[in-house]
UniProtKB/Swiss-Prot annotation:
Belongs to the ADISSP family. InterPro entries: ADISSP (IPR026794). May be involved in thermogenesis and glucose homeostasis. It comes from Taeniopygia guttata (Zebra finch). The gene is adissp. One of its GO terms (biological process) is positive regulation of transforming growth factor beta receptor signaling pathway. Residues 1-30 are annotated as: Disordered. One of its GO terms (cellular component) is extracellular space. It holds the Pfam family DUF4517. GO terms for molecular function: protein phosphatase 1 binding. It comes from the Eukaryota. Residues 20-30 have a biased composition (Polar residues). This is Adipose-secreted signaling protein.
Length: 176
């Protein structure tokens, strides 16, 4: 078989940059680190309050089948008062460890298990001496195990990993 045209053209030259580099790009051979402006990257857990008085706590990226301790601060809620306690909510993935009253609000510490991929929202309820309660929704973006290790926000700490059953690593060889 003939390969017409193969090798008939000269090889093209590569792209060349001027010694000082192109605008916005470092010169070849220099370190190419990415730097973000401080105001563009907020590394703390974000707490927002909606018009109903409930809270949304965004804890950032987490890794699937890992357990995290999450600490965040809620602003003062006049309806609850100083003595706040968690209401029992049957949720195997999110449990409150402690709620501490502070002059500037309440410090909440909870344990969260990232049990599946995607944007997950888990709820917890806090109550005071009055008959009202507030709902706190913890939102996490959970990555699968093949997408690396996420940078955790301030207030989020990995405390362990759940064992994952992987059928390829099974010790059972079947019937002989």
């Amino acid at each position: 078989m003939a390969t017409a045209g193969k090798g008939s053209k000269g090889k093209g030259t590569g792209v060349r940059f001027t010694p000082e580099g192109t605008q916005g790009h470092p010169q070849e051979g220099t370190q190419g680190h990415v730097h973000f402006q401080e105001q563009l990257h907020d590394s703390a857990v974000m707490v927002t309050q909606d018009k109903d008085g409930h809270f949304l706590v965004k804890v950032g990226f987490l890794k699937i089948l890992h357990k995290y301790e999450i600490t965040f601060q809620l602003p003062p809620v006049p309806n609850l008062g100083k003595d706040v306690c968690p209401l029992p909510v049957p949720n195997p993935n999110l449990r409150i460890i402690s709620v501490t009253s502070l002059p500037e609000g309440h410090n909440v510490r909870c344990e969260y298990t990232a049990h599946k991929e995607g944007v997950l929202k888990e709820e917890l309820l806090l109550a005071g001496h009055s008959p009202t309660h507030i709902k706190v929704t913890v939102q996490a973006r959970v990555m699968d195990r093949h997408h690396g290790t996420p940078m955790l926000l301030d207030g989020v700490r990995c405390v362990g990993a759940e064992l994952e059953y992987d059928s390829e690593q099974s010790d059972w060889h079947g019937f002989d």
